[in-house]
């Protein structure tokens, strides 16, 4: 499940990226684009309290993270709106791949921050960290779709 490995891996936001995110003063709904690359075998060495009795895949560890997370996400007003299997890019660096793509919608930056700092949610974060080799998280502001007439194309 691994692909191109960058010399730097990103599993958590930095202080600088967190400050920049808050400084954007985003208004309204927010969609978080998650690109996720799994470890072949989950690494629970930093979170032994969450480790299963036998080794599991990174994908299985991430499934445990999702199952732990969804109740807190829903309680914060958020929702997972898309989950899809990834692969290599059609347009992008050759050999770069992401195993899973996830879109998470939140009503506001405030609701996202309340969710992301909730102590019970954070108690399961070790599943995510054990699962991932690398990740990207891109906050997106929704734009209105253009209203353009559709064309009929004969196949």
Outline where the language-model segments fall.
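Generic beta-strand structural signal
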Residues: 99-102, 133-136
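Low-complexity RS/RG/RGG-rich segments used by eukaryotic RNA-binding proteins and nuclear co-regulators
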Residues: 130, 139-142
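A conserved hydrophobic position in a structured secondary element of the catalytic/binding core
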Residues: 104-107, 116
């Amino acid at each position: 499940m691994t692909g191109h490995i960058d010399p730097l891996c990103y599993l958590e936001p930095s202080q600088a990226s967190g400050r920049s995110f808050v400084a954007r003063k985003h208004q309204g709904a927010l969609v978080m684009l998650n690109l996720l690359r799994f470890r072949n075998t989950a690494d629970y060495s930093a979170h032994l309290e969450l480790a299963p009795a036998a080794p599991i895949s990174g994908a299985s560890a991430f499934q445990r993270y999702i199952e732990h997370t969804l109740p807190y996400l829903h309680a914060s007003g958020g929702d997972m709106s898309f989950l899809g299997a990834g692969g290599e890019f059609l347009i992008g660096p050759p050999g770069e791949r992401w195993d899973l793509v996830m879109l998470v919608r939140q009503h506001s930056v405030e609701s996202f921050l309340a969710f992301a700092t909730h102590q019970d949610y954070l108690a399961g974060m070790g599943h995510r960290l054990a699962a991932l080799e690398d990740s990207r998280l891109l906050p997106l502001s929704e734009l209105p779709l253009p209203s353009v007439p559709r064309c009929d194309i004969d196949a």
